[in-house]
């Protein structure tokens, strides 16, 4: 069962994300909302999350990962939908993400390819955008975008996770 990541989870979370070749920048920042699941032995087995942009209207989906032995179970779709739902609950109207390898997966969820310039313009203060700009990686990324449903109670359910 997914639970919100706590400060005590951050080391394990970062190690898991590194093993999935995902960005670990700014995991503890207030705008970054992360959830994880642990197996019976206490090891992280799935993660998901998003970073809410400073305007509150754009969210950068990030840290969607499934341990290799659990792939093919539908967990990836479940995790992605969870992040999208939580971002919409927080008031986001647009979802964005970087993915060089999983475009087909994200297209199943309604994402379409966009430019990294468009993503960076929508989320200029996102930690991942700033990191990719500073390292020159932004131009090598592939960006994706989709609108989110407008929720009448946006922001009310984020803390409930």
PLM features per residue range, with description:
Residues 89, 93, 100-127, 133:
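Conserved active-site alpha-helix within GNAT-family acetyltransferase domains
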Residues 66, 72-85, 89, 97:
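Conserved acetyl-CoA-binding loop-helix of GNAT-fold acetyltransferases
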């Amino acid at each position: 069962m997914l639970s919100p990541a706590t400060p005590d989870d951050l080391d394990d979370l970062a190690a898991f994300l590194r093993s999935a070749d995902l960005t670990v920048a700014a995991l503890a920042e207030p705008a970054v909302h992360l959830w994880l699941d642990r197996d019976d032995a206490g090891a992280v087995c799935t993660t998901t999350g998003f970073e809410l942009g400073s305007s509150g209207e754009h969210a950068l989906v990030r840290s969607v990962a499934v341990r290799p032995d659990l792939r093919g179970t539908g967990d990836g779709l479940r995790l992605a939908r969870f992040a999208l739902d939580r971002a919409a609950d927080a008031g986001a109207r647009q979802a964005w993400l970087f993915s060089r390898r999983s475009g087909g997966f994200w297209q199943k969820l309604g994402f379409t390819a966009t430019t990294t310039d468009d993503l960076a313009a929508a989320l200029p203060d996102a930690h991942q955008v700033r990191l990719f700009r500073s390292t020159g990686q932004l131009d090598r990324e592939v960006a994706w975008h989709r609108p989110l449903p407008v929720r009448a109670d946006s922001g009310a359910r984020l803390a409930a996770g």
